[in-house]
Regions:
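Extracellular domains of the immunoglobulin superfamily
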Residues: 1-114
Length: 114
C-alpha cells in the first residue's frame, strides 16, 4: 500500500518558534516535495529533493529550510515561525522515471502560527 505519512495533522506554534514538519514515505521514492496550500493560490512548491542530501528551492523557499538525511524522510524546517506561515502543508513523493510519475500525497499538516 502506497503511503506518505506526515507527523501531525494539526500544529499550533507561537511566532518565533522553530517548527519541524516531518514526512516519511515507504515506497523507496527518490523524489520528495513540500507544498503549501492556501485559499485562492493552489499548491505552491516550497522545496523538493531528488535524492538523499539533495535539495532544490521551489517557488516560495523564503523562511523555510529542509533536510533529507535518509531516502525515506524529508523534513521541512521553519527556523522562526511567522503568522504568514499559517497554512496547510502537504508532502508528496514520486519515482524518478522516463515518464511523469504520479505524486503520492500525505494527509497534510495544518499549521497555525499565533
Amino acid at each position: 500500500d502506497v503511503k506518505v505519512t506526515q507527523s501531525s495533522r494539526y500544529l499550533v506554534k507561537r511566532t518565533g518558534e522553530k517548527v519541524f514538519l516531518e514526512c516519511v514515505q515507504d515506497m523507496d521514492h527518490e523524489n520528495m516535495f513540500w507544498y503549501r496550500q492556501d485559499p485562492g493560490l493552489g499548491l505552491r512548491l516550497i522545496y523538493f529533493s531528488y535524492d538523499v542530501k539533495m535539495k532544490e528551492k521551489g517557488d516560495i523557499p523564503e523562511g523555510y529550510s529542509v533536510s533529507r538525511e535518509k531516502k525515506e524522510r524529508f523534513s521541512l524546517i521553519l527556523e522562526s515561525a511567522s503568522t504568514n506561515q499559517t497554512s496547510m502543508y502537504l508532502c508528496a513523493s514520486s519515482f524518478t522515471g522516463p515518464y511523469n510519475s504520479p505524486l503520492h500525497f500525505g494527509n497534510g499538516t495544518r499549521l497555525t502560527v499565533t
